[in-house]
Amino acid sequence: MASQGTKRSYEQMETGGERQNATEIRASVGRMVGGIGRFYIQMCTELKLSDHEGRLIQNSITIERMVLSAFDERRNKYLEEHPSAGKDPKKTGGPIYRRRDGKWMRELILYDKEEIRRIWRQRNNGDDATAGLTHLMIWHSNLNDATYQRTRALVRTGMDPRMCSLMQGSTLPRRSGAAGAAVKGVGTMVMELIRMIKRGINDRNFWRGENGRRTRIAYERMCNILKGKFQTAAQRAMMDQVRESRNPGNAEIEDLIFLARSALILRGSVAHKSCLPACVYGLAVAGGYDFEREGYSLVGIDPFRLLQNSQVFSLIRPNENPAHKSQLVWMACHSAAFEDLRVSNFIRGTRVVPRGKLSTRGVQIASNENMETMDSSTLELRSRYWAIRTRSGGNTNQQRASAGQISVQPTFSVQRNLPFERATIMAAFTGNTEGRTSDMRTEIIRMMESARPEDVSFQGRGVFELSDEKATNPIVPSFDMSNEGSYFFGDNAEEYDN
């Protein structure tokens, strides 16, 4: 897996490229998002969408889901082998919203998957352009991360709802490749592994035979991805133990849960990328912007600049607050669901409120919702500053692996100090340090106890004016430290259920 051993940049993972220099990376990422934009324009033409309808984020999501479904080979194969009533395995579709006589109407469309694959390839220079597909998956995943909390899923696997900040990418499909693996949080990887181990406990044949060999390879690969996210030797050594276990069972589950808890202080490194809805790239391409020539990066100023001058609309339910809907989408666009609200506040330049205080439900509209009362409004996706996205957990001192920030997985490389109650977390570590991982557990607990809340993460890193594209003058914000800014805490957000 790319996240292990070979240090490739995200953009290389994103575009499946081998080592390239910065210019080549910018060009290939540009080619990827340009292809998404061209595909989107073509789909709007096919569906005869007006300019306004093409800028509607719900239409963008339907079109994105259609192309993802058209290329989902395993599911397509499964659907053909297990025909279910009323499902045509060769077709895909979804709701398209059109403006008619001053009202929004829902129209369910159906398309041949073959036709969609043809359009996608044609707009991507004849390639399958899997990088572009993964990019769309990550955008959907970031939207889910900002919209739902995974309390129920956490509890089901024996983890604690307080670990919600470790769950980035928990709804990414398995087929999302190296770029997908890079953005998955520690909790997400732990959860996937625990589910696997539980299946092995319940199903005697899970690890046996030809299939079992493939399962085992997948298990070890997932262990290596998770190991690569940890930044301390003791955590990595524990992952080796879990990976090498002859017959993974409850002991391994215990170890994994212990590691997930430890990641609340000794943060894992998780990538963050600004993946935007297809319609945003479409708008830019339609406006004559040449992504490949100009180059593009998912972790720099480019997405901020793109959002600065794109007008995107969203359907709004009768009792929703348009400003809150905008915040939700802004957070999704910058993969900032687990960022400290104080940092997001500063960058966005308007007040960012915690999930529980948002008067908005998810972006997608269910098929049984009444369209009569739907309105639409412009999403405010602009920002006051921009900042570089990070892939580190924000630990202040890599040698000592000191404190990261609890309930927060930093998105932006911006200096902040780390308000956390060590007592609260250490309480989760009473007792069990025996067994074959005892020395590693003891070492991890020792490191956590020596973590100092007054430490500063991302020392000297700041935000930049939008005119400062070369990032020459960092503005280091000073934050009011009285409160910790987690988005999900004290919260009653909806659950994400597949």
From Swiss-Prot:
Chief localisation class: virion
Pfam hit, one: Flu_NP
A molecular-function term among this protein's GO annotations: structural molecule activity
Motif (Bipartite nuclear localization signal): 198-216
Domain of life: Viruses
Residue span of motif Unconventional nuclear localization signal: 1-18
InterPro entries per UniProt: Flu_NP
GO BP terms, alphabetized: symbiont entry into host cell; viral penetration into host nucleus
One GO CC annotation: helical viral capsid
UniProt region (Disordered), positions on chain: 1-21
Modifications made to the protein after synthesis: Late in virus-infected cells, may be cleaved from a 56-kDa protein to a 53-kDa protein by a cellular caspase. This cleavage might be a marker for the onset of apoptosis in infected cells or have a specific function in virus host interaction.
Cell compartment(s), UniProt: Virion; Host nucleus
Keywords: Capsid protein, Helical capsid protein, Host nucleus, Host-virus interaction, Ribonucleoprotein, RNA-binding, Viral nucleoprotein, Viral penetration into host nucleus, Virion, Virus entry into host cell
Task of the protein: Encapsidates the negative strand viral RNA, protecting it from nucleases. The encapsidated genomic RNA is termed the ribonucleoprotein (RNP) and serves as template for transcription and replication. The RNP needs to be localized in the host nucleus to start an infectious cycle, but is too large to diffuse through the nuclear pore complex. NP comprises at least 2 nuclear localization signals that are responsible for the active RNP import into the nucleus through cellular importin alpha/beta pathway.
Subunit structure as annotated in this protein's UniProt entry: Homomultimerizes to form the nucleocapsid. May bind host exportin-1/XPO1. Binds to viral genomic RNA. Protein-RNA contacts are mediated by a combination of electrostatic interactions between positively charged residues and the phosphate backbone and planar interactions between aromatic side chains and bases.
Membership in a protein family: Belongs to the influenza viruses nucleoprotein family.
Name this polypeptide is given: Nucleoprotein
